[in-house]
Structure formats: C-alpha cells, structure tokens
Amino acid sequence: MPFAPLANDSFLRACRRQATDYTPLWLMRQAGRYLPEYQASRARAGSFMGLATSVDYATEVTLQPLERFPLDAAILFSDILTVPDAMGLGLSFAEGEGPRLAKVVRDEATVAALAVPDMARLRYVFDAVASIRRALNGRVPLIGFSGSPWTLACYMVEGRGSDDYRLVKGLMYSRPDLMHRILAINADTVAAYLNAQIDAGAQAVMVFDSWGGVLADGAFQAFSLAYTARVLAQLQRTGVDGSDVPRIVFTKGGAPWLQDMQSLDCQVLGLDWTANLASARALVGGAVGGPGKALQGNIDPHVLLAPPARIVQQVQQVLDSFGPPHTDRSTTGPTHIFNLGHGISQFTPPAHVAALVEAVHSYSRAQRQG
C-alpha cells in the first residue's frame, strides 16, 4: 500500500538547499524522557528495549512529540546500539546506568568473529519504520538513523559509555589493523541497516557520529570520517516513493573538521553548539545556485532549562548567526535546519520546548518577510 503524500516538505526542501517559508526544525531525542507521555509508555512497555522492539510502542512514542509541537520531521524511535545487539553482543539497559553490551570486541579472536549480521534480526526496526510512515499519514517526513562506524566501535570495545575512551583508543593506537577491521564491518553493517530503513519508508537518513569529536586530528580522518564515507557510498539514493533520500551526518565535536567533512557524499552536516553557524555557512554552505551543504543545528540543549523569554533570545541569536535565509525558489542556496547541538535533556520542561518551536517558526518567518 503506498504511503500518503507529504503535506509538509519544509524539512526535505531545506535538506536539498531549497528555499522554505520558515526555518524547519526537529530535535534530537524529541521522543524521550522529558515527556510525561513517554514515561507512561515506557512504564507500560516495562523497559527501554520493550519500547524499542515493539512496533506499536515505537510508533506511539515516535509520534508523541508531534502531538504536542508542530515539528517539521519525525525521527524513528530506536537506539544506535540495536546494531551491535544484532551482531550478537547482547544489549541491555540497567536502570540509571545506561546501555551495556554483554560481549566486547577487543582482541584478535573477537574481531575475527565479527561479521555483518542478518538484517532479519532488525526486522522490528524496519516494521516500525513502515508503521510510523503509515501513522504519520503524510504529516511530516520520517528520518531513519544509525550510529557511525566509529561511535558503534566505541561501545563495542568499551562495552558501555566511557569518560576517557581508554580501551577503544588504546586498541586504535596499539592495533590499528584490528580497529580498521571492526570499522569496515561496522560501515558495511550500517549501510545495510540504513538501506533497509529506506526500503521500509524512511525519507531521510542520519549518521550519528556522537563520539567522533574525542579523536585527535588525523585519527578522526582515518578512523571516523573514512568509514562514514564508506557508509554513504553504499546508500540508496531514492526511497520507496521514488524521491531522493537526503543523507545527514552529525559529528559531535566535529567543528574543527568541517572542511574535511565537506567532501562527504551527504546533503546535510549537523553541528553541535561549539560551532559558529556563520563560519560554517561561509566554509561549507555554498553560494546561491552553487554546490554546498545544508546545515543542521545547533542550539545548546541546556538553553531549554532557562525561562521561555531567554529561550526566545537564544533562538534568535542562532537564527541571526546563520545569516540571511535563502529565499529564491528558482535555485538552490544556503539553508538551515534548526536543531539542538545534541540530544534534549530529560530535565527539560515540555512548555519550554513549545516556546522554542514557536520562536523558531515565528522569527524565521519574519526574517524572510523583513
């Protein structure tokens, strides 16, 4: 059964560097713990994995922020660690401790055993993508996603989140051959995973390189960027409805390497809050009618802990920092998708998110009419 036509394509237009009536926005982790309705769904599901592996719950939770806020895109509710879980590493979430993998990949034997998994093990994700597309009924586009090869490797070597990345960096420097083997398998797995999401109905896909910024210059290019490029080279260009599927790459802490990332085969580069939007636009945003990258970001998520009046001020600063919006509908030009610089804090009052969304839409409309 074909999916409903899209009523709001502002996000996809901005990804393609096409003019929009306002700056579109969505928020990293927009479906999450800051929403009381998410907490209720999670309680019913019994656990995070109970939510993520249930088509019905994943659909319900993905749509929750859209019921509250007029966001311009939905993002699949899932977790980047479903991929190593499918590789047989055993994902679990202990209360208050974050994700853990039961098995780690740190030596020749465990690296030799690593292989691209059968995507049937992730069928629950692809079924959720199709279910969410149907439930959205054309309201806004659906973004699929994966962790980057490097970010997944961090968890696969460390076994959990890390403060210093001692184990994964130690392996990278002492046995780069093993690290490259892990990353090559991860890249081919991520590509297959994202292609299956596209086949299921994802209208854009995003690679989260959440830990790329912990790498040294040189190491970033060799161990993160090269393998993100390997993923992008394998991705399908069109979705189930025949439209192109924009590709987004977000590297937390990646501002120093924007010029390197300009060569990536993607339409959009995500920025964290340490990046200067004006500088990024000048470096990679391109000119009207010419090639370039759309930019996504990059307000500090903790701005949302401030009173609404302060949030409005900060929103305006971000929009002003990007500079004059592209308005010529006859050609492409520099475009901006508003987002946070990383995931939303669980302590964020939902009313503050409403203030941010309203401020982005109203101020960016005024910019175009001014």
Curated annotation (Swiss-Prot):
Listed GO MF terms: uroporphyrinogen decarboxylase activity
Keyword rRNA-binding found: no
Quaternary structure note: Homodimer.
Pathway: Porphyrin-containing compound metabolism; protoporphyrin-IX biosynthesis; coproporphyrinogen-III from 5-aminolevulinate: step 4/4
Matching InterPro entries: UROD/MetE-like_sf, Uroporphyrinogen_deCO2ase_HemE, Uroporphyrinogen_deCOase
EC number, as in UniProt: 4.1.1.37
Domain of life according to the entry: Bacteria
Record carries keyword Lyase: yes
Gene Ontology biological process terms, A to Z: protoporphyrinogen IX biosynthetic process from glutamate
Catalytic activity: uroporphyrinogen III + 4 H(+) = coproporphyrinogen III + 4 CO2
Gene for this chain: hemE
Disulfide bonds: none
Any one annotated GO CC term: cytosol
Keywords: Cytoplasm, Decarboxylase, Lyase, Porphyrin biosynthesis
Organism name: Verminephrobacter eiseniae (strain EF01-2)
Localization terms from the record: Cytoplasm
Annotated function: Catalyzes the decarboxylation of four acetate groups of uroporphyrinogen-III to yield coproporphyrinogen-III.
Recorded family membership: Belongs to the uroporphyrinogen decarboxylase family.
Protein name: Uroporphyrinogen decarboxylase
Enzymatic class: lyase
Major location category of this protein: cytoplasm
Site residues, Transition state stabilizer: 79
Binding site for substrate: 29-33, 79, 155, 210, 342
